[in-house]
Amino acid sequence: MITLRKLPLAVAVAAGVMSAQAMAVDFHGYARSGIGWTGSGGEQQCFQTTGAQSKYRLGNECETYAELKLGQEVWKEGDKSFYFDTNVAYSVAQQNDWEATDPAFREANVQGKNLIEWLPGSTIWAGKRFYQRHDVHMIDFYYWDISGPGAGLENIDVGFGKLSLAATRSSEAGGSSSFASNNIYDYTNETANDVFDVRLAQMEINPGGTLELGVDYGRANLRDNYRLVDGASKDGWLFTAEHTQSVLKGFNKFVVQYATDSMTSQGKGLSQGSGVAFDNEKFAYNINNNGHMLRILDHGAISMGDNWDMMYVGMYQDINWDNDNGTKWWTVGIRPMYKWTPIMSTVMEIGYDNVESQRTGDKNNQYKITLAQQWQAGDSIWSRPAIRVFATYAKWDEKWGYDYNGDSKVNPNYGKAVPADFNGGSFGRGDSDEWTFGAQMEIWW
């Protein structure tokens, strides 16, 4: 029994405990940083095939990058709650002690769970958010990612799966114009590209296997009295089917995606193509993405006994544009890991890229091999933090590149694929090889 003398102390302690619980902040994030050298001299170089949308990342990252996430459950009553989430990202070239940069405010959203009585388990949200992103870690490639400012309702239980609805936005500088004066159009504004996303996930279709289906529609949302650049892509669709299978203490994901017009450029669900690209003082040129994209992707991570883990990826992507400036991209790679102890391992990554230009018919190819000795917090290929020392060798042979010489009003090939020796020039990276070595840390928490 609490006496009256002890009651104020008990109340104070209880209030302090409740206050501490109420003020608890979740701290999550990701970071990587290190130092590297190039065999022929100078700082570490990184290797990516011209025309490829990503690169094999182990021992092949030349920047310091960090995402710092702070979040808190700010209200809870029974099973109903509100959660506030933020994310600030930084990237610098890791060349000096003091490297100033402007942070990117990538997330600021509120998620409300179980707020709709007749939709138990669902979440409504609004704000900037990383929204249900799908990626291949070993090549840092996001193949389904509509992140940005938006709003939505997710995880609606429909009996055989979970339904999610969302709308997000990505803007392009100079994407539309207004009539100014003297027959001049002003391209300094931005075009708002809206994306509307519908997903049906967690459909159990076989033992250990689930299916997710999605449809994304993107369109340019013009202001009144504005017009799109001639030839710009106004809208497009992305259709996605992904099967996830539990296998060998890991997973395998098989993905098929088909996109049209404005959804083909990045091919991940963000609408692009209503914009105008600028190159310093050069004139503007429009981005015409009309056409289609087909992507077939298989990737995963598995455990092969007590001492071996492995990541792998294989992908074919065909972007076929009406302006013949598309590409066909094949990539295949593996990252086996041998565990000497629960905290020390040797990791090797072997990756190959081949990119064919639709316009020239020429091909760029590269293979890259990295060997790394690593110390990590656990015995999984996903264990982090990790500190690794590495050596990387890359060899490439590029027969084409993009022409950015002059300006778009003088050079009819500006921004287009051309042969490596076009007009006596030198486009692409030629035929060469290089090796690098260094040390890196990587962490997520």
Swiss-Prot record:
Transport as a keyword of this entry, yes or no, is yes
Q: What are the site positions for Important in sugar transport? A: 142
Q: Which GO terms describe its cellular component?
A: cell outer membrane; pore complex
Q: What is catalysed by this protein?
A: beta-maltose(in) = beta-maltose(out)
Q: Which GO terms describe its molecular function?
A: maltodextrin transmembrane transporter activity; maltose transporting porin activity
| BP-aspect Gene Ontology terms | monoatomic ion transport
* Cited Pfam families: LamB (PF02264)
Would the keyword Membrane be found if you checked this record's keyword annotation? Answer: yes
Q: Where is this site: Greasy slide, important in sugar transport?
A: 30, 65, 98, 251, 382, 444
Give the UniProt keywords, A-Z: Cell outer membrane, Ion transport, Membrane, Porin, Signal, Sugar transport, Transmembrane, Transmembrane beta strand, Transport
The residues forming the signal peptide are 1-24
Query: Which portions of this protein are annotated as coiled-coil regions?
Result: none
Q: How does it sit in the membrane?
A: Multi-pass membrane protein
Q: What induces it?
A: By maltose.
Which InterPro entries has this protein been placed in? G_neg_Bact_CarbUptk_Porin (IPR050286), Maltoporin (IPR023738), Porin_LamB (IPR003192), Porin_LamB_sf (IPR036998)
Query: Where does the record say this protein resides?
Result: Cell outer membrane
| Binding partners and assembly | Homotrimer formed of three 18-stranded antiparallel beta-barrels, containing three independent channels.
Q: What is this protein called?
A: Maltoporin
Q: From which source organism is this entry?
A: Shigella flexneri
